[in-house]
């Protein structure tokens, strides 16, 4: 997005983009679809008749169509007035298609779509329907199956696994290794997956799955949102590097695991599976305990639950740190054994 914000409640998700000149547009995400938006204009087609009329699935600044017309931004050849257009090409009028986009933005959208709709289109090879540098990648698609928290985490952590662009490739043609910006990158700081659960009591509906540090090497942990305080392991992050902090522990793990990727990958994958499994199991147990005997002070109960989740995350993260440190130490360049002499 250029300046994009997602809004959601139990019933709807809307995506709003600022399109410059103090104007905005918003589009309702179809109930059965997902959206991919790298750091560029995302919305592809826009129904101005709906936005300026009923506003069922599209909304915008009252004068946006006038702004587009007056500044000659409509690049369509059909001669339809923007205010009457039902499939206005937003990207052509207001988006970017730069060389930087083609190494920084469109490849990430391409990979997410490729993961979630692997057989809908041809994504690779000379006959591909879409490539990493395509400017017409869909803004939203209906996935081939329901999307899980793990699916979202995977695409937000991805680095072109299974393609020639994977920066960790060691075999085959390496000429394209690392040529595109990954989604899981060294400077990831924070990722949150918001889950709203309409089947739960109001106080338990909101869950935020949180991970910190480089997404390639971290894992999301579920936390209830109706709480009084955040566990210190997550909350008290300062500039001082310490393993007392979930953030810094993840940063240390990533720095070592990246440099020693083949030796450390199995440790990271086992950690991710163990922490994800524990998160689901603990969330289920806490939900069931509440439903069996609803607490008068739900916030206090959920705050205590979050502390247990943080404690579990710390235990598993400390264990990962120990294993990654050992594996990285064994590959230090100053290693030497008597048998080497």
Specify the residue positions occupied by each region the protein language model found.
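C-terminus-biased signal that marks the final domain/tail of proteins
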Residues: 2-13, 22-341
């Amino acid at each position: 997005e250029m300046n994009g914000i997602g809004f959601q409640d139990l019933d709807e998700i809307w995506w709003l983009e600022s399109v410059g000149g103090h104007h905005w547009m918003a589009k309702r995400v179809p109930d059965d679809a997902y959206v991919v938006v790298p750091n560029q204009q995302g919305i592809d087609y826009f129904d101005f008749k709906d936005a300026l009329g009923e506003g069922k699935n599209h909304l915008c600044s009252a004068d946006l169509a006038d702004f587009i017309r007056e500044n000659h931004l409509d690049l369509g050849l059909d001669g339809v007035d923007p205010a009457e257009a039902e499939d206005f090409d937003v990207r052509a009028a207001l988006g970017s298609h730069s060389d930087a986009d083609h190494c920084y933005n469109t490849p990430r959208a391409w990979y997410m779509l490729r993961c979630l709709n692997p057989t809908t289109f041809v994504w690779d090879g000379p006959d591909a329907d879409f490539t990493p540098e395509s400017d017409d990648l869909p803004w939203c698609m209906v996935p081939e199956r329901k999307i899980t928290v793990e699916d979202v985490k995977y695409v937000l952590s991805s680095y072109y696994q299974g393609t020639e662009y994977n920066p960790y490739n060691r075999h085959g043609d390496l000429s394209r290794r690392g040529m595109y910006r990954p989604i899981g990158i060294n400077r990831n700081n924070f990722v949150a997956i918001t889950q709203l659960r309409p089947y739960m009591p109001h106080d338990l509906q909101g869950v935020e799955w949180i991970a910190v540090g480089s997404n390639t090497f971290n894992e999301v942990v579920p936390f209830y949102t109706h709480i009084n305080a955040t566990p210190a392991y997550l909350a008290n992050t300062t500039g001082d590097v310490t393993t007392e902090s979930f953030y810094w522990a993840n940063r240390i793990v990533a720095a070592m695991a990246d440099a020693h990727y083949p030796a450390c990958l199995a440790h990271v994958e086992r950690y991710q599976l163990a922490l994800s499994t524990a998160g689901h199991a603990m969330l289920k147990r806490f939900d069931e305990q509440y439903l069996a005997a609803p607490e008068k002070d739900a916030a206090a109960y959920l705050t205590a639950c979050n502390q247990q989740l943080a404690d579990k995350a710390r235990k598993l993260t400390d264990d990962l740190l120990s294993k990654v440190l050992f594996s990285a130490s064994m590959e230090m360049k100053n290693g030497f054994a008597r048998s080497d002499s």
